[in-house]
Every structure is written in structure tokens, then in C-alpha cells.
């Protein structure tokens, strides 16, 4: 590969492979470029869920986990698995952070406010982690606990909150330490695109008890919203029972383990230079506990601190003096940077980053192309500049539009991506470059669930494609997993993968006399 003929690793977020074309937006879409490649270019399928990506067996993959494994080239035990193991082996109940906080609150006679996504989804949180916290509070005879619950409907069926509430009420019967004081859809509480108009009413509910509506219990509220065609994700910030807002001296515990959708709400409490909206009140908290580290610049007390990773793909490229570009639209920018670098905030030498703003629409089925065309233009300019040896880019459409459950819009998103891929390859071909295409997890290939008779808005456990365009190389294995991508990419560059990368090299140069 010549000095400035770029190698592009294109990650099609949420583009899984499913032989069944029923409810499959990828199969339904008109994709002439993809179809041509699938017939003529070397490709295999990669596992992107469960144990091969450090998750519990059969747990669907997700963007954070996918990008970490693509970048790391080894299996990383995910925070979800770490916390599950800690619960099972008793270490969770002995966690020093939890004990310190509860002991302090008992002394000061203040309250603990536990907030997070009440969901069995296992993508951003898991309700079992909340239940373990309730058991610990009960064990320590601490009963001043208020729950502020965010509803899912995105990594779970759109109307599934009542099932989770039933489980929670069973736990509260066993461990009567807490009351449910508010509910709110994740659309508001877990925004990650600086749409502060969504987050502000959540903050006002938590800190002042302000809410358009108040209900005696969460079930009554949810039935009301369902009757008005509002599913879990979109339930507005709602007060439940008596108002118990967060006061000076209280502690907050955010039990989500995934960082990207926890940062904004956390910053409303902790960021000294916060400018998202005017905060009418700012409680002086004794602690703000986060299950994991959300951001090194947000000084939370972290229950499960990060485990550092060395020699990720970005670091190896940098140490070999190669220039790299990371490019994505807002929705997936953290994934091709922070998560791809193993949860490391720092930027490597010769690593550049470009973020293309995601469109400001309520849901992405209203604009299925999202910012793919703008991203493509920027990507082509970067290829033509010949400034980069490696470009790592993410197209968000299959995932973000797939999450809406809107089949036709997702088909449009896939067709838009096919056009973008064709344009990117044209530019690469003109510059003598190579293209690797893969995905972080599935989504758009399964858009309806016959089991729930609802739109399938969550990720899937299907494998993802791994396709090589550029000639001269072939795959040596019939299947692999996400951890094999980094070693294979390094092989294309003539670099020996470091020993930390336990993934396999799946590509081999064609021999002249084959």
C-alpha cells in the first residue's frame, strides 16, 4: 500500500445479517452496490453478540461493545458482565463505594436517590443491578431511598415497562426500602445530542418535583400514557406519589453502566461550567455515584472504575507513525473515538477527528438519510486529500432508524447507505485505496417481533458482515468475530498485531501463482 492510498474501515451501525428476509429492511431495500459486492468480493460473517464480545451468553450486541471490540482486537469483559459477576460472587454487596455512601446518609439522616433505566435490556443498564442495590440497602437497614425510573421501549419492546414494574414491585415487597417517586422515558432522560430541551424537564422533576402530571403510582401513569398512544421511550417526566425531590446533603446513584447516554444528565448536577439551560436550583450533593466512569471530567464517585486497555488499533497505528481519521455523525461520534480507543479519552498522535452534526429531528424515521450525505462528502474530501493512511468511519442510519421500528423509513435509510458506499468506493478506487466494511451489531435486519406482536426496535444477536473491497486479498476463515477485525486490518497494512490482540488475522494476500 503506497503512503497515501487510504484504507477505510467503514462500520455500518446496526447492519446485521439475517437469511430470513421477512421483516428484514436490508433484504427489502434496493442495494445494487451492496449486492454486487456480496456476489463478487471476499466476505464472511462475524459474531457480534454474547461471549465473543465479552457479554453474557446470547446477550445482543450493542454499539459501545461492538466498537470496543473492533478497536481492541481482544475479548474485553464488559461492565455488564463485570457487575453481574460481582452480584453473583458477593463482591457487589461488599462494594466499598456503596457502603461509604449509605453509612454517610445514615449519619446525616439524608436520602439516597437511585436513578437509571429500568430495563432487562442489558444495553445501558439492567434492572437486576437495581434489585441488588435494594437488597444491599435492606441488608444495611437503610430505608430512605427514592427511585427515579427511566423507561426503555428501545432496547426492549415499545410497551414493556409494566413487566419490569411487576418485577420491581416483587423486589420491593422483599426489600421494602424504597418508593417510586418519578418515571420518565429515556427519550428525555438519556439524550446524548445536547438537546437540552429534553433534559431540562427531567432535571426540574428531579430537583424541584416539577411535572405536568402526577399519578398515585407508576402503573396508573403508564396505563394513562399507553391509552394516549405514548410508549415507554416517550413517557414525559412524571411525578409519582408524594414529591421527594433531591435536596442538599442527599446522594444520587445513577445505576446505568453505559456512559454515552448517562453523561448529559450527570453533567447537569456536576459540570461547573454547565450552560445547557438555566438551573433554578442546584442541590449540594454529598455524593454522586455512577455505576461506571461516565467521563473523566465528570467527577462522580465510581463504583466500578475502568480497566485500562493498551495497544488498541488506534494506538498501534499511531506508534507505527501512521495518520488516522475518525469520522461519524454526532450520534456515533463517541463510538469511533472514545469506545474505539478502549474507553480512553485521549487522542493519539496523528489521530484526527471529524464530527458531522446529526439532524435535529424528534425521531430519525422523519429523516432516514440522517447526515449520511454530508458525512460522505466529508469522507470523500478526506480520501482525496491523501492525508490519512487509515480512515475509520461510522454510518449510523441502519441502527438509529431501525430503533424507531418504522420499516419503510429503515428501508430508505439502507438505500441511502448503498448510494453513499458506492460514492466512497469510487473515491477510494481513484486514489488506489482499499475498503473494509463491517458492522458493530444487528438491528435493521429484524424489524418486527412475532413473539410480542410489536415492532422490533432493539438490537439483534445476528452475525454481521465483514467484506473486503480492493482486490489482491482473500479470507482464510469462513467465519470470525469482531475481535478479528483489528488484526486483519493491520495485516493489510503489513503490520504484525501486538500480543495483546488475541483476534485472528482473517485475510491473506493472493499468491501470484495460485
Swiss-Prot record:
GO MF annotations, alphabetized: manganese ion binding; phosphoglycerate mutase activity
Pathway(s): Carbohydrate degradation; glycolysis; pyruvate from D-glyceraldehyde 3-phosphate: step 3/5
GO biological process, any: glucose catabolic process
This protein's record includes keyword Isomerase: yes
Coiled-coil stretches: none
Entry GO terms, CC: cytosol
SUPFAM superfamilies: 2,3-Bisphosphoglycerate-independent phosphoglycerate mutase, substrate-binding domain, Alkaline phosphatase-like
Entry binding sites for substrate: 124, 154-155, 186, 192, 258-261, 332
Matches recorded under Gene3D superfamilies: Alkaline Phosphatase, subunit A, BPG-independent phosphoglycerate mutase, domain B
Reactions catalysed according to its record: (2R)-2-phosphoglycerate = (2R)-3-phosphoglycerate
Subunit-structure text: Monomer.
Function statement: Catalyzes the interconversion of 2-phosphoglycerate and 3-phosphoglycerate.
Similarity field: Belongs to the BPG-independent phosphoglycerate mutase family.
Protein name: 2,3-bisphosphoglycerate-independent phosphoglycerate mutase
Organism whose genome encodes this protein: Legionella pneumophila (strain Lens)
Lineage: Bacteria, Pseudomonadati, Pseudomonadota, Gammaproteobacteria, Legionellales
